[in-house]
Each structure stands twice: as structure tokens, then as C-alpha cells.
């Protein structure tokens, strides 16, 4: 934040854009940036806002895919089930859509995308090409759009607002499509600041290209001392680097703590009842047994999928938590939250109970909801109108 504070001393805050790769990074930045006039956003949210896209009516997601399946006979029996990951991109189970999304993000032909994803043997690429062609036609005729269009159309339609300085965070995980958007914004700006670490790239499976970050030109300011990694973990990480085919050579020192590594300990033997824990697994499937274990212990936890609770309840909990942290949220997220707020319980002013009152919202924080949308609820998530039988699983 040092460079941002420096810019705020000499630049109109409304002409500063802070672009974060993930929703989590954007939320964290909103908590740390005290000047409300600075534009803090993910690329998708920024593009959607400037393009004035209606994500509730024209974004292809969920049931909205039914229209396309009726339009394209070859897609009638295909599933378009997906979830939106932290970077704002849909993750499809359908191999054709995996290839199409990857190709758009990487800016490469479909057959090359299928090869890189190792789907060239199991997927009919000619069918993939026809699905893509039908999808383009359908969007042209209906005005529907996909998540990637929030970025590509932002550039194509020259929608960048007046910006003097742009900041980019977590740059190592940007795809070529996202880099196009950043370079376009940068071309409209006087100064740019880019933060990232190619060693931390994790989204290559959806098209991230750390080589673009590695090859950037400009003045560098290496952050040598780690604030997180103790010596033991640092030593393990250093042993991995020689096996990486391409990386930016850098000096990197551990923080002043020893740290510990425990190998081959069954998760059943770990005491999760004290402290805060983050559990990472290589695949989502591996989390299933861990989640069941947490349920058995009556421990509260947050995960992308909690089958014992309705998705809208989990989303309402997350949205309320984010709002209390100072984050901005969109109207789609708020609609789930509003289902658990009532006038009777003092959560809302009379006349604001219907989530239809939220239609004009693009992005808003807790203060805005209190000032303009009748919100009166305050406190932890327990005040939400959740069934008592469900609260123990949150």
C-alpha cells in the first residue's frame, strides 16, 4: 500500500484504479484502502460496471443456459453446470465448455486448447467448434453474454473510464485475455504498478500465463523478506525451485521464525478445536471426508460446498461476513441475504423486505445498504433468520 498512499498525495482518488485478480483480494483491498473514491474491483466487476451489463437477466449462468440449449439442438443433452471460482471464471464439468473457456482465456485455437488440457482424445473437437459457433450466434441474437465477455467487450468497445494511475495485484495469475484488458487500461493511464510473484501462480489450469508477468519491463522493487513463511517451510520451498522449468530468479528470505512440517499425520488425529485452520487439498473430492469429519465434531467451517446447508443460506452467511468486513457486494449476492432478513425481527425497515428493491444495485457496502435500502440489522451472522437446526453446521 506504500505506492498507493504515495499516489493519493498527488492524484485525484477517483482517477486511481486498483485491480485485483480475485474477489478475496479485492475485498481485502477495500478494507485497507480508506479512501472510498479509489476504484477497487476485480476485472470482471470493473468490465461489467463500465459496460452496464445486467448480470441478473443476461448473464449465461444456471437456468439461463436453458435458452441456449433450446436454440442449439446439439446441446440439448449437454450439462452446463458450473461454479464460479475465486477469479470470477466459471468452471464447467462439460469438456466442450472447458476447452472453449480455456481457448478464450489463452487466446488460442480450440484444437490447441484441447491438446493443452489433454482432452484431445476424449472430446469431439468438431462438436466443440459447432457449440462455440452456435454460442456466438445465440449471444448476437439475444444480447446474452458470458463472464469472459465482461473483459473482452470492455476492451473492444473502449469502455475504460478516465484513469490516471492503475494498480494490479496478483498479476501472476492473469490469463492472456486478462492481460489484454490490463494493457488496455495501462495505455489510458499515466502510471501503472504491478504486484505479483510467479512462484505463486496457481491458475494455469484455466489459462494463467506467468511468462507475461516474468517478461514485464519496468522498475522493480523486490520484497525480499517474507511476512509469512518461516525458515523450515522456506527451506522446503527452495528445494522445489530447481525443478521449475521457468521462473524469475529472486532473492527471498524467510521470516524470523523456525516453523514445523509434520508428515503423514491422519487428519483424525489433529485437534481442530483450537486456533484458526486452513485446509488445502489437491482436489475437491479429497475434501469430502474432511468436511464429514468437521460435521461430526460440530465445528464451524467454511467451504465452497456444504451439502448439509442450502447454497443460498451459505451464500447469505458469506455475504453478511464480507459486508461486516467492509466489502462491496452485488445485488445477486444480496438477494440471498435478503431472504434471511425480516421486518418483524427488526432487520429491515418496512417497505424494503422484498429483494426486488435491490434491482438498481451494481455494487454496494454495508453503509450504503443502511443509508438507501432500509437495512437495520447489525452484529454477527447469528442475527440472520436461519433455522436453529442449521446454525450448528455453519
Regions found by a protein language model. Name each.
Residues 1-58, 235-238:
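P-loop NTPase Walker
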Residues 11-15, 35-37, 51-67, 161, ...:
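Short, polar/flexible loop-turn hinges at active-site or ligand-entry regions and domain interfaces
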Residues 56-76, 214, 240-248, 316-347:
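A polyampholytic, Gly/Pro-enriched intrinsically disordered region
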